[in-house]
């Protein structure tokens, strides 16, 4: 009797353990990733998606170039450079005609903050607001989620180097 119970329990546990990687999307792969400016834009290709709907999320952080502006329109440089964060999402439909054999291109872009509170920006007083003119990106993370279950299928982190004209990000 105990042998049967242990056998059934073992089969049940093996079924759960074997099914977990399948539902977690362990076969999803990211390739050909390149980054460019606009905000921070990541383009690439995902494979191993099957026909599942997925969301591609980019989370990034960096140091802003800040100009303090008062209500009269006067401008002075900000005296502080706190790290700021931005993110963006792209939905990839499993029935999209661009998806072939479980493979899909993507292009996801951050939605950047435009302003920062005066005291964080190093502006002279509360009559000023910090306007973010540009962000020197330092870090980025691309995550892929199953749209129906929100399960994380893939995550890749990058170190970024930014100039006023270009950005280069390499996997950590």
Where are these regions (language model features)?
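Bacterial N-terminal signal peptides
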Residues: 10-17
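Mature extracytoplasmic or otherwise solvent-exposed domains
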Residues: 24-172
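Generic N-terminal leader/processing signal
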Residues: 1-2, 16, 27
């Amino acid at each position: 009797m105990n042998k049967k119970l242990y056998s059934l329990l073992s089969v049940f546990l093996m079924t759960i353990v074997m099914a977990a990687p399948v539902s977690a999307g362990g076969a999803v792969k990211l390739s050909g990733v390149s980054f460019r400016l606009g905000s921070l834009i990541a383009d690439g290709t995902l494979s191993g998606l099957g026909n599942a709907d997925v969301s591609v999320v980019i989370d990034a952080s960096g140091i802003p170039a800040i100009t303090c502006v008062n209500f009269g329109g006067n401008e002075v440089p900000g005296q502080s450079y706190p790290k700021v964060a931005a993110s963006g999402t792209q939905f990839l439909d499993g029935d999209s005609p661009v998806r072939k054999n479980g493979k899909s291109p993507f292009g996801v872009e951050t939605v950047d903050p435009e302003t920062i509170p005066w005291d964080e920006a190093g502006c002279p007083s509360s009559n000023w607001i910090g306007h973010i003119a540009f962000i020197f990106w330092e870090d980025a993370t691309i995550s892929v989620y199953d749209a129906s279950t929100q399960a994380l299928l893939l995550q890749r982190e990058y170190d970024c180097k930014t100039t006023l004209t270009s950005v280069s990000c390499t996997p950590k």
